[in-house]
């Protein structure tokens, strides 16, 4: 088992039975609520996520998030213009960010805006809208409208789930809508997600795998998922 996942092929090989037999048994176990099936694997972790506070998220997989944040810095160019979404991993990126040259940063996050405003070579543009306590960021039609006159090189987002069938998801529809608007305002979308997000699903759908360009994650990502994501044309950067 790797990162909470076990592959159907591995079980079949260990037990000396066919993959079809294992898949049948997994369907029975899933119906009993013992596990959850994904493409080619199974997990004891419930795949559906709920909206929790950014403070709670920040305490989860903190070491992996810091490593992801350091790797994400290498994509920043001098005099760049970027969008930073809300979320604990993107906040970790903002904390680590030390750009060369003047950088324009657009964000819906009050926390990230405050962090970026402390840097002399960063100009911050904060979106307006309804403030959500869990994320300490704004969402809604005013935030979406504020992106119509923006053109950036990259958008950095977190997510609550990455699944082959459902794509990139988050906990709420409101967050998904704003993320879609941010994607339209950027040339590239970079997903910052620790490996615990793979095989999970949120209620709000951001997009399919082919809608994003780069995923930065840690080495806990299951090999089967990594291969299929790369087959979809997504670049994956793995950090230790």
At which residue positions do the language-model features occur?
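HTH-adjacent hinge/linker in prokaryotic transcriptional regulators
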Residues: 1-88, 94-106, 110, 117-122
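Conserved phosphate- and dinucleotide-binding cores of soluble alpha/beta proteins
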Residues: 4-9, 16, 31, 64, ...
């Amino acid at each position: 088992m790797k990162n909470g996942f076990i592959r159907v092929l591995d079980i079949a090989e260990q037990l000396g039975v066919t993959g079809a037999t294992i898949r049948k048994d997994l369907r029975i176990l899933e119906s009993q609520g013992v596990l959850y099936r994904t493409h080619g694997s199974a997990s004891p972790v419930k795949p559906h996520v709920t909206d929790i506070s950014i403070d709670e998220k920040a305490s989860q997989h903190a070491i992996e998030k810091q490593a992801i944040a350091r790797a994400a810095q290498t994509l920043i160019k001098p005099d760049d213009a970027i969008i930073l979404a809300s979320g604990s991993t993107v906040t970790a990126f903002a904390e680590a960010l030390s750009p060369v040259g003047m950088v324009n940063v657009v964000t819906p996050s009050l926390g990230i805006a405050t962090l970026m405003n402390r840097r002399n070579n960063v100009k911050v543009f904060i979106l307006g809208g309804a403030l959500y306590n869990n994320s300490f960021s704004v969402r809604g039609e005013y935030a979406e409208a504020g992106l119509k006159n923006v053109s950036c090189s990259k958008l950095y987002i977190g997510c609550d789930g990455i699944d082959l069938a459902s794509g990139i998801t988050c906990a709420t529809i409101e967050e998904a809508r704003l993320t879609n608007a941010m994607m339209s305002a950027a040339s590239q979308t970079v997903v910052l997600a620790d490996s615990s997000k793979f095989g999970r699903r949120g209620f709000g759908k951001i997009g399919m795998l082919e809608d994003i360009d780069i995923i930065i994650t840690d080495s806990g990502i299951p090999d089967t998922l990594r291969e299929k994501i790369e087959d979809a044309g997504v670049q994956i950067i793995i950090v230790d």
